[in-house]
Amino acid sequence: MGGFTEKQEALVNSSYEAFKANVPQYSVVFYTSILEKAPAAKDLFPFLANGVDPTNPKLIGHAEKLFGLVHDSAAQLRAKGAVVADAALGSLHAQKGVTDPQFVVVKEALLKTVKEAVGDKWSDELSNAWEVAYNELAAALKKAF
């Protein structure tokens, strides 16, 4: 990787704002996408036990936290060239037994959600910026296992 560019960070920042403009709606898109690809994922998220409930504050809060972490990862990549994950968060993912294929499902759901949030502003460049930030966050979480 040739370093996370200023443009990549700007793309993540602007599309993150689009996500934040309607967190409840995009939280539903995000978790619905996860459950469509991996129905067993509901066991990893206690707040999904009864499905995707758009009024569940835990569902909305978790989506907002995840998207915020990826957004913050973009900033870390730009500033420091690396992402450092919270050890407790890495430990939680290890305790839950999160696997590489599950990280991929979450990434795909994240990209689908961002695509919906930005509409016609979606591009390969935008997708790549989010993918790099997410992949680096996932790698940092796995290191913290």
Curated annotation (Swiss-Prot):
Residues involved in heme b binding: 65, 93, 96
Cross-referenced InterPro entries: Globin, Globin-like_sf, Globin/Proto, Leghaemoglobin-like, Leghaemoglobin_Fe_BS
Binding residues for O2: 62
Localization, UniProt: Cytoplasm, Cytosol; Nucleus
Gene Ontology molecular function: any one: oxygen carrier activity
One Pfam family here: Globin
Biological process according to GO: nodulation
Gene Ontology cellular-component annotations: cytosol; nucleus
Top-level taxon of the source organism: Eukaryota
Post-translational modification as stated in the protein's UniProt record: Nitrated in effective nodules and particularly in hypoxic conditions; this mechanism may play a protective role in the symbiosis by buffering toxic peroxynitrite NO(2)(-). Nitration level decrease during nodule senescence.
UniProtKB keywords: Cytoplasm, Heme, Iron, Metal-binding, Nitration, Nitrogen fixation, Nodulation, Nucleus, Oxygen transport, Transport
Residues with Nitrated tyrosine modification: 26, 31, 134
SUPFAM superfamilies membership: Globin-like
Tissues where this protein is expressed: Root nodules.
Domain Globin: 3-145
UniProt main location, coarse: cytoplasm
Record family assignment: Belongs to the plant globin family.
Role, per record: Leghemoglobin that reversibly binds oxygen O(2) through a pentacoordinated heme iron. In root nodules, facilitates the diffusion of oxygen to the bacteroids while preventing the bacterial nitrogenase from being inactivated by buffering dioxygen, nitric oxide and carbon monoxide, and promoting the formation of reactive oxygen species (ROS, e.g. H(2)O(2)). This role is essential for symbiotic nitrogen fixation (SNF).
Subunit-structure text: Monomer.
Protein name: Leghemoglobin
Classification of source organism: Eukaryota, Viridiplantae, Streptophyta, Embryophyta, Tracheophyta
